[in-house]
């Protein structure tokens, strides 16, 4: 299922306005990390490998809302860490809805049942629940047994209550195409409002460095997997152009300014994955980052992205 029509129209109008202004670089999705703390230690995550003094910090609701206004991206992805561990997450979500931004609240779902009826049911809010495979694979990736069952039950309950729900699915090296195929078939009856797919991006600080896809392997994997997606077999929330890109049938230049990252450390240079320093403001990020030095053709650190 593609994104809702109103969301597509708003984003399309935003992009058109930027082009009319002659704006070459502009944000589409604010990656907002109100905290780095988490209740899991996933094998592929480099975000929670921070010193305790950083893990104990939270962004305030005002800081989150000011950052959204400052960059003015139409979409906000609230990540972390586990956002539901933030003591004021509801206030943050409600504030972003008042700004009429489309929000993807990323969560491992361990705490989600405590927020049903508290998080607003709104066309501006999507619950993006991490599901990276069937039970054995998912629980291995998050390094804790029982998480898969909680996540699946949370999907079912959230849909019954009227929330918009998607899966955030990352495939790691070691997952076969057949396993991914079986997993995507499993998701169909859950009634998700779409499935988002990616390969595991390399975090230098992640505890497990052996299970990241390289660029070539990513393309081979998705070419075979998506070749099985006949007649809309799976409800994938991506444009055909992105799916062609995943398969290596199309190439794009890197546009890290399109997904600026704001956290307790500031505006991260250049993107969510690479940490080459921080700016104090969005304007400083845009003005002082050497954007041309990034991308898989220009920088070895970006080679497998």
Model-derived regions, located:
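A broadly conserved sequence feature marking short terminus-proximal activation segments
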Residues: 1-15, 262-276
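Conserved alpha-helical substructure of the radical SAM core
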Residues: 2-118, 122-123
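Short, P/G- and charge-enriched loop/turn segments at secondary-structure junctions
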Residues: 17-21, 245-250, 291-292
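Flexible mid-to-C-terminal extensions adjoining Fe-S/redox cofactors in radical SAM and related proteins
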Residues: 26, 251, 265-305
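Processing junctions and N-termini across compartments
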Residues: 32, 36-39, 248, 296-299
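Generic structural signal for helix capping and beta-alpha/helix-loop junctions
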Residues: 52, 85, 113, 136, ...
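Radical SAM enzyme [4Fe-4S]-AdoMet core and its adjacent flexible, acidic
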Residues: 57-60, 99, 128-132, 140-259, ...
């Amino acid at each position: 299922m593609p994104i809702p029509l109103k969301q597509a129209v708003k984003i399309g109008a935003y992009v058109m306005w930027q082009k009319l202004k002659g704006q070459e670089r502009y944000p589409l999705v604010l990656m907002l990390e109100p905290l780095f703390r988490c209740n899991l230690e996933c094998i592929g995550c480099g975000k929670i490998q921070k010193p305790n003094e950083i893990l104990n910090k939270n962004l305030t609701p005002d800081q989150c809302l000011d950052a959204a206004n400052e960059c003015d991206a139409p979409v906000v992805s609230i990540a972390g860490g586990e956002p539901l561990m933030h003591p004021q997450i509801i206030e943050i979500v409600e504030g972003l809805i008042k700004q009429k931004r489309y929000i993807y609240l990323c969560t491992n779902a361990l705490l989600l049942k405590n927020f049903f009826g508290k998080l607003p049911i709104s066309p501006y809010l999507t619950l993006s629940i991490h599901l990276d495979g069937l039970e054995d694979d998912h629980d291995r990736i998050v390094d804790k047994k029982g998480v898969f069952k909680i996540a699946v039950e949370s999907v079912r309950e959230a849909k019954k209550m009227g929330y918009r729900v998607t899966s955030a699915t990352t495939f790691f090296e070691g997952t076969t195409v057949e396993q991914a195929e079986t997993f995507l078939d499993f998701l169909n009856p859950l009634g998700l409002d779409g499935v988002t797919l990616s390969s595991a991006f390399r975090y230098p600080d992640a505890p497990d460095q052996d299970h990241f896809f390289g660029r070539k392997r990513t393309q081979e994997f998705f070419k075979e997997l998506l070749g099985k997606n006949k007649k809309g077999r799976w409800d994938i929330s991506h444009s055909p152009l992105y799916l062609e890109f995943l398969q290596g049938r199309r190439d794009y230049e890197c546009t890290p300014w399109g997904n600026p990252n704001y956290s307790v450390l500031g505006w991260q240079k250049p993107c969510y994955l690479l940490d080459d320093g921080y700016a104090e403001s969005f304007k400083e990020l845009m003005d002082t980052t050497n954007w041309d030095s990034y991308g898989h053709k220009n920088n070895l650190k970006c080679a497998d992205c």
